[in-house]
Amino acid sequence: MAQFLLSCESTVDVPFAYMHSRGIPVIFYSYIIDEQPYPDDMGRDPEALPRFYAFLDAGKLPSTSQINQFAYYDYFKELLEQGGDVLHIAFGSGMTQSVNQAYEAAEQLRAEFPGQRLEVIDSLCSSSGYGLLVDGAADLRDADKSMDETIDWVMAWRKRVHHQFYSTDLQYFRRGGRVSGPAATIGSILGICPIMRLDDRGRIIAYDKARGKKAAVRTTVDMMAVHAVGGTDYSGKCWI
């Protein structure tokens, strides 16, 4: 039996069914379109993802918001009421400051549940890299490692998860203010794809560019081989 309950957030970007199968509860972010909030439920509702992509096809740009302290409080309280200790691995602070809301909620609940532990860790990770870190923590939990052993592993490995990605559409970066309008237009016409990674604080860094998707894929794969332990002989997990 696991010594503690492991928890995460929907930005692990894997199907809800997978996290459920691993016994990992999830708190959902939301996205907002036309002032209407929709849960990022990781496909738990089979209509959710088709609806989201239909919005994008219609030219609607979603916005997101942080999970607030009250939502974290209710979520953590429900987990603590199951009677065990809780380790929550949060979405990286380089992408959102929601983790600060989680810290505040956890501090409040520690006073209400003095006989239990509630620990919150900033993953410094995003998307499937975040999911990979949580999955590794679940492996330790299932191997009957203690919460402290798992925390030590997460703290050591959160800066070793390598995120590598690219984009074929600069217009989303223009809307987010990361590139200027003219640069986005010219880049899109020329087929320029920025090559990106996360730095050790979990922030997006555009460090290179490629002309066309094939070149972007090739550069991405090459850089993954450079950073993987053992290079092309790496045989561990890799989440895409």
Task: For the regions a language model picked out, list residue spans one by one.
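Mixed-charge interfacial surface used for oligomerization/domain docking
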Residues: Q3, T11-M19, I24-Q36, L87, ...
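N-terminal glycine-rich anion-binding loop in soluble enzyme alpha/beta folds
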Residues: L5-A71
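N-proximal short alpha-helices
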Residues: D45-F52, Y75, L79, S123, ...
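N-terminal, well-ordered alpha-helical segments
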Residues: P50, A54, F70-K77, N100-E107, ...
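N-terminal glycine-rich phosphate/adenylate-binding segment common to multiple enzyme folds
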Residues: Q69-V99
